[in-house]
Amino acid sequence: MSLVYMYMYIGVVMSARIQESTNDILKPITCNTNADCAKFCKGPIHNCVYHTCQCVPGNPHCC
């Protein structure tokens, strides 16, 4: 296995692990619409368009 492929493999594994993390850890969520953000966060959603919001489930200040 060449070094390039090894780095790519490690990158894929690491990114998958980041997505799995839960339990009150702030994680960026890519949201294109208010509805996208509402899937992850309760409370009022303000102008969530084409950016990443830091939020955890239940955080009213998602975007």
Curated annotation (Swiss-Prot):
Annotated disulfide bonds: C31-C48, C37-C53, C41-C55
Gene Ontology process terms (BP): defense response to fungus; killing of cells of another organism
Cellular compartments per GO CC: extracellular region
Signal peptide as annotated in the record: 1-15
Keyword annotations: Antimicrobial, Disulfide bond, Fungicide, Plant defense, Secreted, Signal
Location of this chain's protein in the cell: Secreted
Family recorded in the similarity comment: Belongs to the DEFL family.
Name of this chain's protein: Defensin-like protein 278
Organism: Arabidopsis thaliana
